[in-house]
């Protein structure tokens, strides 16, 4: 069960009740999308940053979303205060509740975005398996990687057996709220062959009642590498159980749910849960066909199973009192999703009219089959069965030319055929609400094929080794996923959704500068992004719609300064103005996007290698609540947190102690406002929103985490 679909169901309920990359002045072109990492130094003209394995190891943050939040342009929404990032959402350039559908996630350069609202599960990647993370901001990534890269692309590059740092390693963690984790990795190399395996196991009681987590992850890769031929085979699997505490009202409601934000650790849904099991196989090879010409072929199959159960906690007869012992299953979700792909491409380096030139061109094909049963309880005949197939076939090319030793230009394009076939099988006999629908609740069949296109134009000019400017323009698109086409449903939601969501499109332009003075580095850029048919969920009616035109205007600046050999500081600031351009909400803010956010950090090698101190502070400004397109409700308050980590190494042993949220801030960064009730059989005229009423997901205060381990 995805975080997005969970938020949809909770939203429907509340609607009823209430590293900076330096430039080099040289003719050689930056590598783009070749071999193991398809991003490397990024596309010309884009704002790109890299997080290394050393950055991850030294950071007090112990999950990917919090590590990523220490980069400009990125904000995070937490639902469960989970130490490993389970159910967290990473938002790149201001997309709020559906951020996960507007950021394209890659692992080793391959798409891993699932065809549902869970998107990418950050908790499924062991941190000890990561070699680096590459972030490319803006629309340009769609040209190379396909639909969904509206806010940008995040590429997680995993260690290989021959990677630096990929040694045999074991480590253990213990922390607040019964958090325990074990990690292990092993690597070996023999001639052209190498193998690496990484895994971890997590158990946590969680900050809130019914927020327990059990997670298991493993990935392994076999590689073969010679100068003219390389190949790999990888397998990854993960298994998760997650309790699902809903949001808490901001006031006590006699006769309603018993707990409010006055007791933030409590849960009004102590029985709800979600499970996930997934396995992924990938294989591929790269071969040098002739000098400067390389063929790269990848293929993969991913299969994911998800189950979730939601309960009705109110008695079915007067006085309709809240009960846990008498709670009955209200909604059960059993989903199977299979995605297969093949992506052949050519990387050609040559001279074009005497100028160094690199051309990357290829085809990618993805086929996803989504089947979801929705009975009221396990073992019963489904009320709805959703069967959706999506196929995409893309053709793309990206050409990069060194016009001069100090100037590069890139131009690329993609055309992509998108086909969707969707069916809903409805059983009125098994639907307790069957008699209340004004029309047939079965979603009409939907079959569609369309062509979409993406483009990128980028330019970079280096005035010297110390100063460069860059700019780009791009077009991108994203398709509605299965959960967005299905909607939320649930009791008292009598609007029948449609599978027919329009494709979201976007144009953006960006310009910036880079400064590299050795000890001091800085990157700053401004951008404008204009979108049409942005896909969004409305809890008041329980379905997804295409919004009126929207836009983002932003400024991002990141800096790094090496004070001396032992001490370095970093910081960044982000401004995003995300608004509606047209329609009844023209000029209003997009919910769940803070205009201002930032981070600052200090790393001090107190005793080099033996003792290191890292201090990180993160700040996000106030933001509109989910479901508050009208901008009438209170704001989610601004907040800042400080994390501290002290760690060291001796011989082959290492240790660390982290204190997170040092000043014990009690806050939330996700809340959903009352949106009223749409017209229906129980409320023919509908009900307006209740101003000041909202549900929030409170987060933990001060926590600690201890680590010890060894390499061998």
Model-derived regions: residue spans:
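Extracytoplasmic beta-strand/coil segments of soluble accessory domains associated
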Residues: 37, 65, 69-110, 114
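Short strand-turn segments of transmembrane beta-barrel domains in outer membranes
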Residues: 142, 153, 157-188, 199, ...
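Gram-negative outer-membrane beta-barrel transporters
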Residues: 409, 417, 521, 526-531, ...
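C-terminal beta-signal and adjacent terminal beta-strands/loops
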Residues: 477, 569, 619-628, 648-712
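Short acidic/polar hinge/loop motifs at secondary-structure boundaries
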Residues: 110-138, 157, 500, 539
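Membrane-embedded beta-barrel scaffold of Gram-negative outer-membrane proteins
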Residues: 284, 288, 294-300, 304-312, ...
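Transmembrane beta-barrel wall of Gram-negative outer-membrane proteins
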Residues: 174-203, 208-247, 271-290, 294, ...
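Face-selective signature of the C-terminal outer-membrane beta-barrel domain
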Residues: 229-236, 275-433, 460-462, 520-526
């Amino acid at each position: 069960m995805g975080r997005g679909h969970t938020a949809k169901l909770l939203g429907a309920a509340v609607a009823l009740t209430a590293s900076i990359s330096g430039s080099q002045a040289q003719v050689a072109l930056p590598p783009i999308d070749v071999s193991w990492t398809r991003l490397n130094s990024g596309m010309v003209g884009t704002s790109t940053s890299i997080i290394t394995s050393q950055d991850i190891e030294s950071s007090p943050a112990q999950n990917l979303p919090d590590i990523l939040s220490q980069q400009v342009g990125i904000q995070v929404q937490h639902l469960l205060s989970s130490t490993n990032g389970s159910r967290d959402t990473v938002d790149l350039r201001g997309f709020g509740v559906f951020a996960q559908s507007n950021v394209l996630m890659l692992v080793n350069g391959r798409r891993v975005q699932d065809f549902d609202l869970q998107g990418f599960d950050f908790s499924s990647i062991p941190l000890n398996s990561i070699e680096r993370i590459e972030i490319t901001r803006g629309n340009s990534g769609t040209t190379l990687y396909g639909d969904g890269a509206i806010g940008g692309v995040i590429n997680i590059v995993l260690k290989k057996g021959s990677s630096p740092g990929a040694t045999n390693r074991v480590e253990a963690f213990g922390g607040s709220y019964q958090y325990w984790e074990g990690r292990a990795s092993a690597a070996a190399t023999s001639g052209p062959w190498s193998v690496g395996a990484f895994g971890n196991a997590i158990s946590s009681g969680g900050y809130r009642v019914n927020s327990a987590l059990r997670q298991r992850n493993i990935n392994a890769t076999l590689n073969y590498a010679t100068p003219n031929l390389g190949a790999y085979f990888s397998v990854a699997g993960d298994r998760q159980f997650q309790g699902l505490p809903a949001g808490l009202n901001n006031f006590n409601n006699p006769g309603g749910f018993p707990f409010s934000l006055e007791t933030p650790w409590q849960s009004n849904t102590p029985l709800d849960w979600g499970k996930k099991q997934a396995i992924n196989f990938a294989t591929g090879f790269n071969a040098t066909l002739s000098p400067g010409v390389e063929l790269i072929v990848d293929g993969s199959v991913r299969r994911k199973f998800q189950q979730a159960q939601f309960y009705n906690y109110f008695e079915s007869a007067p006085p309709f009192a809240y009960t846990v012992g008498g709670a009955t299953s209200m909604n059960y979700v059993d989903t199977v999703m299979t995605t297969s792909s093949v992506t052949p491409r050519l990387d050609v380096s040559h001279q074009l009219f005497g100028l160094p030139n690199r051309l990357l061109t290829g085809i990618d094909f993805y086929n996803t089959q989504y089947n979801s049963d929705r009975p009221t309880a396990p073992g019963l005949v489904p009320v709805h069965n959703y069967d959706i197939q999506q196929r995409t076939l893309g053709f793309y090319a990206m050409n990069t030319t060194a016009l001069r030793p100090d100037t590069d230009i890139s131009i690329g394009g993609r055309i992509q055929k998108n086909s969707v076939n969707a069916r809903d099988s409805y059983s009125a006999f098994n639907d307790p609400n069957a008699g209340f629908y004004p029309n047939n609740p079965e979603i009409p069949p939907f079959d569609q094929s369309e062509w979409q296109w993406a483009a990128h134009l980028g330019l970079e000019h280096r005035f010297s080794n110390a100063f460069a400017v860059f700019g780009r323009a791009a077009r991108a698109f994203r398709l509605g996923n299965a959960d967005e086409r299905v909607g939320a449903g649930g009791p008292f939601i009598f609007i029948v959704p449609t599978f027919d969501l329009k494709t979201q499109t976007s144009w953006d332009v960006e310009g910036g500068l880079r400064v590299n003075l050795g000890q001091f580095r800085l990157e700053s850029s401004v951008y404008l992004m204009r979108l049409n048919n942005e896909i969004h969920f409305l809890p008041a009616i329980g379905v997804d719609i295409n919004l009126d035109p929207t836009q983002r205007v932003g400024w991002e600046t990141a800096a790094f300064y090496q004070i001396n050999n032992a001490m370095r500081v970093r910081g960044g600031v982000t401004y995003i103005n995300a608004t509606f351009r047209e329609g009844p909400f023209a000029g209003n803010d997009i919910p769940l996007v803070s205009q201002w956010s930032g981070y600052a950090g200090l790393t001090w090698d107190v005793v080099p290698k033996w003792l290191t101190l890292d201090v990180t502070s993160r700040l996000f400004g106030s933001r509109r609540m989910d479901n508050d397109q009208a901008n009438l409700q209170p704001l989610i308050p601004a907040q800042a947190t400080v994390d501290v980590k002290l760690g060291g190494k001796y011989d082959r042993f290492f240790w660390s102690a982290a204190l997170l949220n040092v000043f014990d801030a009690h806050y939330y960064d996700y809340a959903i406002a009352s949106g009223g009730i749409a017209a229906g059989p129980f409320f023919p005229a509908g009900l307006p929103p209740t101003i000041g009423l909202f549900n929030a997901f409170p987060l933990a205060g001060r926590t600690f985490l201890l680590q010890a381990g060894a390499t061998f």
